């Protein structure tokens, strides 16, 4: 599941740290 910046949902089950890391890699 791809979340949009500023709209990340803590219920997604994935740590926000990894989500932000993907944005940076990204």
Swiss-Prot record:
GO cellular component: extracellular region
Keywords: Gamma-carboxyglutamic acid, Hydroxylation, Secreted
Residues modified to 4-hydroxyproline: 5, 10, 15
Tissue expression per record: Expressed by the venom duct.
PTM-bearing positions, type 4-carboxyglutamate: 4, 8, 14, 18, 20, 25
Biased composition (Acidic residues): 1-12
Domain of life, source organism: Eukaryota
Location of the region described as Disordered in the Swiss-Prot/TrEMBL record: 1-26
Chief localization: secreted
Compartment(s) of residence: Secreted
Further comment: The mature peptide does not contain cysteine residues.
Protein name: Conotoxin reg6(gamma)
Gene source species: Conus regius
């Amino acid at each position: 599941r791809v979340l949009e910046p500023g709209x990340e949902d803590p219920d997604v089950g994935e740590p926000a740290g990894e989500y932000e890391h993907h944005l940076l890699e990204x």
